[in-house]
Amino acid sequence: MVKTKDYYTSQKSEFFTQFDGFCERVGALIEKKYGEKFKNDVMGEIKREFELIFDEIPYIGGDENFLTMDLVSAAQDLALYQVLKRYDKPVEEIGEIAYQESEQYLRDNADLIPPMTHPKYVFYIEMAAKGSLEREYSGDWAYEFIPGDGENDYGLDFIECGIQKLFHEHDADEFTPYLCAMDIPMSECGNLGLHRTQTLAEGGDRCDFRYKGGRKTEVASTVIKKG
């Protein structure tokens, strides 16, 4: 069984293939906003930055933790942020590019969004939540399962966030709320009916996810005014 950092080494080819797709999408968005020359100047830097960050992604259980992919995906956005900040681009513009990339990917690949309101998946999430509270890995999320009450199929209260921890280590706290906002298109494209009023990254004491399949997504965000 692959353990600790060996996991990322064993999966590097797959993760970097996914990163190539990310680069195609953000490259088009960067060119649209800043021009072809700027895109050509920075894309190589973004790829090198991701290679550096990739080597520092904390192990949180590998394939046994469904949030591992979220952490790797966030590292892609972090590479984008770090490079564009060096070119003095404001966080609002970087965040807009990152959000648009995520929105495009989710709309084009809605079939890949986990069926988070399906009863079998809800049971899996409940078990995962219990395991997260053991805090086996310092870079992981910790979250509590909230049983359904009629109004919601179920909820999750995140009290620790792996993305927030990773971004804090890289002095990217101002960028974290844009990753929170990406839950909006995920809910819309997956028909998850997410309601959320606060996040850790935006000053809350938890991220209060509440799911109800089929209803309208309503997510409070300090950076994206939508949903």
Locate each region found by the language model.
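Short, conserved micro-motifs enriched in small and acidic residues
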Residues: L67-L71, E174-A181
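C-terminal structured interaction module
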Residues: P177-G227
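Hydrophobic, Leu/Ile/Phe/Ala-enriched alpha-helical segments that form helix-helix packing faces
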Residues: I30, L84, S132, D183-M186, ...
